[in-house]
Amino acid sequence: MQIVDAQIHLWGSGLPSNLSHRQVTAFTPEEAISLMDEGGVDAAVIHPPGWDPGSTDMAFAAVRNYPGRFAIMGAVPLDRPESRERIAGWRDQPGMLGLRYGFLADPARQWLRDGTLDWLWTTAQKAGVPIAMLATDSLREIGRIAERHPGLRLTIDHLGGRGGTSTLKDAAAMTHMPELLALAKFPNVAVKATGVPHYSSEAYPFPALHIYLRQVYDAFGPRRMFWGTDITKMPCSWGQCVTMFTEELPWLMDLDLELVMGDALCAWWGWGRTV
């Protein structure tokens, strides 16, 4: 079984602007590989963070230096006209799988709702570029986008929640769940089950969150549910993030477990890594 983390951040300078992440000035590919090997993680998808302007270059270097271990979900500036021309060849870059954006704050949140980004959905669909997003307040709007662009693969981050931007725990962090589950009717929408321990006030194996994982599994199925960590804000080890799914969820087993732990993500984002 290949174990592929759907989201990590790597950086080489600056402190994370999101205080839930480790407040260190670097988390390098070398550090990540060491911890991945220790935790039994085969590969990970890098999401270059905005607080380090060199993070995308670091991600490309990681792809080169550790073949098959890393891929990238990158970004183009949404407010620059020249960005539109870059989408067509986006996946031609080594290791680049797609695009990822946060839509929790204005102006990006407003652009999501008022049609400003219609060009993005149309262009990405035509180019076969999947998009991941953090958009807790806009799940209904994402449904409308998914319906209008059925060939565009959309992925919702962090169980649809606010990830590290929120201090809410347990049920209080999951009040959006009905709106997230409603998106399951769109076959082009998937969910990252990333960062789950961060939402828990309990110790490992974070049992209060298991009910929400089961709800996402029942609604979206194992081909549209992706394990991952966002490791630099986890209250536990990488290995425990793995075993929470592989050992503590008795309803997740066999082929479905293999899908959730990596196979489904690679298929959804088109990562043809060699196992």
Task: Describe every region a protein language model picked out.
Residues 7, 36, 59, 90, ...:
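Conserved, mostly hydrophobic/aromatic
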